[in-house]
Amino acid sequence: MKDTARATVRIGFDGRVHKTFRGHFARERFEHEVRVLRYLEERGCTFVPRLLEVEPEHLKIVTTNCGGRVDHLQAERQVEIFAELEQFGVRHEDRELRNITYRIADGRFCVIDFEFATILDDGTGKPLTLTPSLST
């Protein structure tokens, strides 16, 4: 289990990932991550988690498991992985190794944690990013 100021993340016995948002702007981060994951699924991006359940009342999502953490990766390869994501119209704004996993089933590096990502074109030609309201 991962327990931080922004979220708790646990992997169930069935392998599914349960993420519950908390802390500053939790609702906005939850809604934005859901929006980004749905956007990527619509575009056929297969190296990100797929949403299985969305529980707005608990600020919780359940996703597929994208593999285990990566402890070492060449900087060039890390840049390539995040650049590949941009081909699907999303820029990851936290391009750290902690947001890359390795899925043994197909030998694929995957990207996780999209609460601060930017959708490069929201359909109007403008980018869409997390914009927390000051009222929360």
Question: Which positions does each model-derived feature cover?
Answer:
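Acidic active-site catalytic centers that drive phospho-/nucleotidyl reactions
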Residues: 33, 94, 113
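Conserved structural core of kinase catalytic domains
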Residues: 22, 26-30, 38-81
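Hydrophobic residue at the +6 position relative to the catalytic HRD Asp in the kinase catalytic loop
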Residues: 95-102
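C-lobe/activation-segment region of protein kinase-like
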Residues: 75, 87-90, 103-136
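Short hydrophobic-acidic sequence motifs that mark active-site Asp/Glu residues
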Residues: 9-10, 15-19, 48, 62, ...
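Structural motif
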Residues: 12, 55-57, 103-105
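ATP-binding glycine-rich loop module of kinase domains
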Residues: 1-38
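Acyl-donor (CoA/ACP) binding surface of acyl/acetyltransferases
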Residues: 84
